[in-house]
Amino acid sequence: MATNTESVDLVGDEAATNLARAALFAALVGAFAYVTFPNPVSPVDVTLQVLGVFLAGIFLGPVWGGASLVLYLAAGALGAPVFEGGSAGFGQLVGQTAGYLWSYPVAAAVVGAVVHRGATLRDLDSVGLPTLVGAMVLGTVVIYGFGVAGLMLVLSLGPIEAIAAGAAAFLPAEALKIAAAVGVVRSDAIAAA
């Protein structure tokens, strides 16, 4: 007697793969949050999170790159220790780092949209260095625009003080993160994995 079974795909293979990649990059940003350095001229520490934001946008594109950072924020808000130095909870999303955190999905989407010239992923070998660097500079502007606004709101800082403490103080570190991201993209390490 033959048994007839039918299977129903609730989620396509491509969607499942993209969701898994988004979760992986959310975890990467969370791991990078543990790498912190005090910044003597800012109330906010330097972390490697922004490097993860750049990489999410570059490798996943604007849609899934942004989604990965929404997943990251949700995990942290629900108690996963993925924010700066292993902190967690919704309070982080309304505290002094709130502007930076809320900017991450937008910045990843912007970086991905510039690198891929839209929502469809393209071969990263065809992306020129000026486009790659320009996308990350634009992502940095988004992150520090949100971050400065958050510092002004939460800490009642004036615009000049907020820009000095919330953006200018981080520019050397951001240049290094951009260089690191270029190194990762231009190496064949990710493609080989």
List where the protein language model places each region.
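Interfacial helix-loop-helix junctions of multi-pass membrane proteins
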Residues: 80-86, 150-164
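Interfacial aromatic-anchored transmembrane helix boundaries in multi-pass membrane proteins
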Residues: 34-45, 73-107
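Short helix-perturbing small/polar motifs within transmembrane alpha-helices
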Residues: 2-8, 17-24, 31, 92, ...
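Membrane-water interface at transmembrane helix exits
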Residues: 33-37, 76, 111, 115-119, ...
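Hydrophobic transmembrane alpha-helices
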Residues: 2-66
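Alpha-helical transmembrane segments and their cytosolic interface
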Residues: 2-23, 161-193
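Alpha-helical transmembrane segments and their helix-entry boundary regions
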Residues: 65-69, 101, 132, 162
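Small-polar-interrupted transmembrane alpha-helices in polytopic inner-membrane proteins
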Residues: 25-29, 65-80, 147
